[in-house]
A protein has these predicted regions:
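C-terminal catalytic histidine-bearing segment of alpha/beta-hydrolase fold enzymes
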Residues: 246-319
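Alpha/beta-hydrolase active-site loop
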Residues: 113-144, 237
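Primarily recognizes the serine-hydrolase "nucleophile elbow" in alpha/beta-hydrolase
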Residues: 136-208
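Short amphipathic alpha-helix adjacent to the substrate-entry channel of hydrolases
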Residues: 74-96, 103-105
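Serine-hydrolase catalytic-loop signature spanning alpha/beta hydrolases and amidase-signature enzymes
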Residues: 68-71, 93, 137
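Short beta-strand element of the alpha/beta-hydrolase
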Residues: 56-68
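N-terminal cap/lid segment of alpha/beta-hydrolase-fold proteins
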Residues: 23-56
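The feature captures the conserved acid-bearing segment of alpha/beta-hydrolase catalytic domains
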Residues: 178-249
Length: 319
């Protein structure tokens, strides 16, 4: 009798473990959302397996990879644990392709200021168009995927962060990009890992943006922390954007890492996951009007270079 009881107890325990493992399984599906000449653009959807059969619509994180508009992968292994974390928190995560226009351009064509400025603008425009097409694809499948199209959060790393921020900037200024999306659409929030906005002249916001979460190191030599300007065209970094948001009293969460470079384009996906969830729960889904700035100080980096020139940024991005 005793042995039988132990056997039954062990069987029940194994069944419970199997149930938990099954409940935590992440389902991944890949879809083609656009074909543009030689480029077939795909996206990967991640969702908790036990949420697929639910009835409640879920918020979505639309992620764009980094890679300097020269490369990168939507399924980079370094991103997957971040996607799974968000999926377990109740989000549908969509990681999208976009065309990387700088990969096929001879570096000699953008080695000078004007050439670099022109090539970068074209690459950003192309990436943002594809990001918008991925957004439309999600909206078109919102019923089938059981997602809430009013709760799509744009997210990106480095070049992908520029893409996500630029998409929001274009919507707020009612440009031709906004016409590609449904009427009155806006992202519910943006999470930027070392991003910037590309604008001719100082950025202007016709409409206030959605809540923004901006991670940036003030020693970043790849994407400017504050700004990098070539005549009229400039890349306006997280610090500059945050100053504008503060004046407009628009909700934001700005995370500054002093003495840190471009590693903030990926490290928050591991080190700041709960900060990200707090932003999503409070400022995005909870619609709290908060202006939050967190400064990470490192005593070991008391002396560091942060006054980069436009030439410094060009050299770094031509590697």
């Amino acid at each position: 009798m005793g042995k039988r009881f132990i056997f039954i107890l062990m069987a029940c325990s194994l069944l419970s473990i199997a149930t938990v493992v099954h409940a935590q399984h992440i389902d991944k599906q890949t879809y083609t959302f656009a074909i543009k000449k030689a480029d077939t653009l795909k996206l990967d959807k991640y969702v908790m397996i036990d949420q697929i059969q639910g009835t409640q619509s879920k918020p979505v994180i639309l992620f764009a990879f980094g890679g300097g508009f020269k490369g990168g992968r939507r399924d980079n292994p370094d991103y997957i644990s971040y996607f799974h974390f968000l999926a377990r928190a109740g989000y549908v995560v969509v990681s999208t392709d976009y065309r990387t226009q700088l990969k096929d351009i001879d570096k000699s064509e953008y080695s000078d200021l004007q050439g670099f400025s022109s090539a970068l603008q074209q690459a950003i425009t192309c990436a943002v168009e594809d990001f918008g097409d991925a957004t439309n694809y999600i909206i078109e499948h919102s019923v089938e995927w059981q997602i809430n199209p009013a709760q799509i959060i744009a997210c990106g790393s480095s070049a992908g962060a520029i893409t996500a921020l630029q998409a929001e900037y274009e919507i707020c200024n009612q440009t031709a990009f906004a016409d590609r999306l449904p009427a009155n659409f806006n992202y519910a929030g943006v999470i930027s890992f070392s991003g910037a906005i590309c604008a001719n002249g100082i950025p202007k916001w016709i409409m206030s943006p959605c809540p923004l979460m901006l991670f940036h190191g003030d020693a970043d030599s790849t994407v400017p922390f504050t700004k990098a300007v070539v005549e009229e065209m400039g890349l306006w970094g997280s610090n500059f954007i945050c100053m504008q948001l503060k004046e407009k009293e628009t909700a934001y969460y700005f995370y500054i890492a002093e003495g840190i470079g471009h590693s903030l384009s990926y490290s928050p996906m591991k080190d700041n996951r709960h900060d990200i969830l707090s932003f999503l729960n409070r400022l995005v889904l909870g619609k709290e009007k908060r202006c939050i700035t967190t400064v990470e100080k490192n005593p070991e980096t008391s002396r560091y270079k942060s006054d980069f020139t436009i030439e410094d940024y060009i050299r770094e991005n031509m590697r």
